[in-house]
A protein has these predicted regions:
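Cytosolic juxtamembrane helix and N-cap/initiation of the first transmembrane helix
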Residues: 1-29
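Membrane-interfacial loop-to-transmembrane alpha-helix junctions, especially the N-terminal start
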Residues: 18-20, 81-91
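A loop-to-helix transmembrane entry motif
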Residues: 20, 47-67
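Hydrophobic alpha-helical transmembrane segments and adjacent interfacial helices
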Residues: 28, 32-34, 72, 93-107, ...
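Membrane-helix interface motif
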Residues: 31-44
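Juxtamembrane helix-break-helix junctions at the cytosolic face
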Residues: 69-85
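Membrane-helix boundary connector in multi-pass membrane proteins
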Residues: 80, 84, 95-117, 131-132
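Membrane-water interface at the C-terminal end of transmembrane alpha helices
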Residues: 121-138
Length: 138
């Protein structure tokens, strides 16, 4: 237990690790939003592009859930030795956040879409800016 606490405290000082966890949490929130009632699509025109790709909100929930869990897995100590896996995890999260930003922008470019695109785009960029000295190759 003491070793686990030490591991967590060491990692939680890393801005990269914290952002990885938070950005993965955002995807899990999107999973929850699409999975539960009421349906999300009728609530906002910003979701129009999501609906055009697939009107099944359950499919979107699975997509966001798997992406978020993959991101959380990238923070686990088991993968700490595999630098390429961690970098890939960061890249996948960045790609998913960029796609989400683009879909929000296409769904409602005139109103909330552009601001939402910038928000999601900046989250994507933030996830690519990991600190190599804290993720040394083994």
């Amino acid at each position: 237990m003491k070793e686990a606490a030490r591991w967590f405290l060491t990692r939680s000082r890393s801005g990269t690790w914290r952002s990885h966890v938070v950005l993965s949490g955002v995807l899990l929130f999107m999973c929850w939003q699409f999975a539960g009632p009421p349906p999300t699509f009728p609530l906002s025109s910003s979701y129009r592009a999501f609906q055009d790709i697939s009107p099944d909100e359950g499919a979107w929930a699975v997509f966001f859930g798997l992406s978020g869990l993959q991101g959380i897995a990238g923070t686990l100590p088991v993968l700490e030795r595999f630098y390429a896996v961690r970098v890939t995890s960061c890249a996948v999260l960045a790609a998913v956040h960029t796609v989400i930003g683009g879909l929000f922008w296409m769904g409602s470019p005139a109103s909330i879409g552009s601001g939402t695109f910038l928000l999601w785009g900046s989250m994507a960029l933030g996830n690519l800016l990991w600190e190599p000295r804290q993720c040394p190759p083994s």
